[in-house]
Amino acid sequence: MLSYQDTYYSDNEKCQNYMQDTEIHGTIDFVCGAGDVWFEGCKIVTEKRTLDGSGINIITATRTSDTPWGYIFNRCTIENNVSMFNYGRSWHTSPRCVWLNTTLLTPEKLEATRFDDEGMKISSNYFKEYHTTDAQGHDITPKTNKVTFTLRDHSQPFVAETIMTREETKQYTVKRIFGNWRPDKILKKLEKQSEKLKKQYIK
């Protein structure tokens, strides 16, 4: 998926979506919306906002309201083609966004706060990160990252720790979030069927 802003927009307060091995390109708030959405093994690419590549890119803008989990990125890779970027910012309601086991191809270009500290309509959020690595597989997750989130006018200060503990990550499983609907298992079944058809018809 390739666009500038709002490349992927989950415009449903109660949606439950699952994406795997998808490539998403954009510049600002290009993965945005509500609901519970699991991104598995996806490639996230930040494109240039300006011709000279200046400016800061923001990947997500969540507005979680009627669901408990929000956006979950697991085993995703971030390719950055700009000067600086961050994981995301709060939109409104009760934004939630978690990055698990992320690979950063240009970790030196991730903002120090890691998430945008200025929300659009609300400052409070649940923004978390766990086990982030560089392209060589080295764990580059800071031991702690407390951020003071505010609105653009610096009102509503909200201090939060954005680094998760291993114990906290245990609640994030496809089974727990989606219940009896197991999109991960459905995809595995389809992949096996596809391989079977290839062997049968492509010689």
Model-derived features: positions:
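Sequence-level preference for short, compositionally simple segments enriched
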Residues: 1-203
